[in-house]
Amino acid sequence: MGSLLFDSPVGRFVASFPALSAAAGLIVAISFIYIRFIKTPKLDLPVVGNPGDKWDAQKHIVAGARKYPDTPYILPMDPPIVVLPIKIQDEVRNLPENVVSFTKEHQRNFFAQYTGIGDHRPEMITAIRQDLTRHIVSTIPGLQEEVRYGFDKEFGDCKDWTPFPLYMKVLRIVALTSGRVFVGRPLSREEEWLQRTISYTMDCVKARNAIREYPWWKRRWVTSSLPEIAKLTEHRTRGGVLLKPIMDAQLAKDSKREKIINEETGDEEGNFIEWLLKHTPGDLKMDPENLALNQMVLAFASVHTSSMSVTHAILELVTRPEYFAPLREELEEVRRADGHTVDDDGYIRLKKESINKLRKLDSFMKESQRFNPPISTSGTRICTADLKLSTGHTLPKGTRICFPSYDVHHNPKTTTYSPEYNPPGYTPPDQFDGLRFFKLREMPGKESRHQFATANHESLVFGFGNHTCPGRFFAANQIKIILAELLMNWDVRLKGDVEQKGGPEKRPQNMVVDLVITPNPMAMVEMKRRSRAV
C-alpha cells in the first residue's frame, strides 16, 4: 500500500516535501492500524434488531435465539456482538485465551492500555478459588456480625415505618460485609475505605466513558490528562497507604507459625490478605499499591453485583408479599432444628450448617436472579484467532461473541424449565415462582442441583467454563445472610404500600442499557424493626 502511494505522480510530489511526506506516511500507518486492529470484521450472518436499540437488546436476544436456534446471529451493538447457539457451548467455553479471550474483551471494553482496568490478576483468582472457597465456613460468623452491624448503622432504630433508598443502603451493607472478609476490621469500617470500594466501580465506568468521547487515534495523547484517569490512580495510591500497615504486619508474621483453629467453625483461621499475598509473585508482595489494585478489582467484581442481587430480591419480595411467610417459616424451622448462638448484644446467630439448609430462600434468590440477571448474555469473549464453529461458520479474529443466557433461562424447551423435568404444579418459565428450584430439589436425585451458585449448561448467570465466577459460593452466603437478617428482624414494604399488598406491576422498573440490567437506583422502600426481632 505504501509503495503504491509513493510510485504515483502525486506520491512523488508529496515525497519532495519532507513534512508532507511524513504526513502521508502517518496516514498510511494510521490506515493500516485501523484496518488491521480496529475495524470491525464483516460477517455474513443474520442481524437481529436495529443499531441504536439500546433498550430492546434483551428482547432481541430472545427473539434471535428462537428464530435462529442453530446458527449464530448478530446484535448490531457498538461494536457488534455475535450470539452463538447454546448447543455449541461445550466447543467454546473452555477454549484457551489465545483463541477466545475473556481478559482481552474486558481490557477492550475498559481501555486497559490507558486505565489499567482488566489486567489479569492470577493471584486474586487463585486466592478466591483455592483459599476463600475452602475456608468459606470460617467467614460465616464474621458475615453475620457485620450484617447486623450494617443494618443497625444504615437503618437505625426504625421503630416506625421509615423510607430509605434501597440500592444505596444495600450497597453500603454489602461493602461492609465484603470488607470484613477481604481486609478485616478496623479498616473495613473506615468510611474512606468503604467509599473507595464502592466508588471504584463507578469511577471505572466514568473513565471508560470519558475515553470513548475521543476518536481512537487521539486517545493516546489525551488520556493521561483526564481527571477520570487521575481518580483511578488516586484510588490505587491512597488504597496502598491504607493497606500498607496490614500488609507489613502480615509479612512480618512467622510463615511457620502454628495455625489457629476457629472453635465455632472448626476451620483453620486465616484471612484474605494472607491468602492473597501467598499467591502474589516476587517483589509485588512488598508493593502496597499492587495489593490495593487487587482489592479494588475485587470490589469491582463483587460489591455492586451482589448489591444488585440483594436489591432485586428485596424488590421481588415486597411486590410478592406472599413469600414472606414461607421464607420466615423456613428460617424458624431451621433455627429450631439446628439451634443457634447468641452474641454479646443478645442477638441470635444461625449455626454455620444452617445457611445451606435455607433451600426456600436459596430458591427465591435464584428465581429473582433469573428474571434480573446483571447481564442478558453469558460467556462474552473476543476472538483472538479465527474461530471455526461446528455450525459451519468461521468467525474472524476480533469478533465479539456471547451466548443467549436470558433466553436459556426463560425457554420452556430448556430441560430445567420444561414440564417433563418438573414436578406436578409446574410453573412456565415466563412466570415468577419463588419456590421453583426448591420444588425441583425436593425431587429424588436433584437434591444438590439448581442452587443459587450452580453453574452449568442451563444455569449461566455466573458463567460456565474456564471463567466461571470463582466467588459465587461466597456471594451466595453473603446474600443469603443479608436476606435472612431482613426476614428475621425487619418489616419492609414499597414506599406508600401501607396495606402491604404488593403487586408485580408496582415493582420499580429495572434500568436496561445494552445488555446490562440494574435495579432502579431511585426505588424507595419503607422499613421498621419487627416487634419480635431475634
UniProtKB/Swiss-Prot annotation:
Triggers of expression: Expression is induced on AF medium.
Family matches, as SUPFAM superfamilies: Cytochrome P450
GO CC aspect terms: membrane
Biological pathway: Secondary metabolite biosynthesis; terpenoid biosynthesis
InterPro entries per the UniProt record, alphabetical: Cyt_P450, Cyt_P450_CS, Cyt_P450_E_grp-IV, Cyt_P450_sf
Binding-site positions, heme: 469
Membrane topology note: Single-pass membrane protein
Cofactor(s), names only, from the UniProt record: heme
Chain positions carrying an annotated carbohydrate: 466
GO BP: secondary metabolic process; terpenoid biosynthetic process
Catalysis: reaction(s): ilicicolin C + NADPH + O2 + H(+) = ascochlorin + NADP(+) + 2 H2O
Major subcellular location class: membrane
Keywords, comma-separated and alphabetical: Glycoprotein, Heme, Iron, Membrane, Metal-binding, Monooxygenase, Oxidoreductase, Transmembrane, Transmembrane helix
Stated role: Cytochrome P450 monooxygenase; part of the asc-1 gene cluster that mediates the biosynthesis of both ascochlorin and ascofuranone, a strong inhibitor of cyanide-insensitive alternative oxidases and a promising drug candidate against African trypanosomiasis. The first step in the pathway is performed by the non-reducing polyketide synthase ascC that produces orsellinic acid by condensing acetyl-CoA with 3 malonyl-CoA units. Orsellinic acid is then prenylated by the prenyltransferase ascA to yield ilicicolinic acid B. Ilicicolinic acid B is further reduced to ilicicolin B by the reductase ascB.
Protein name: Cytochrome P450 monooxygenase ascG
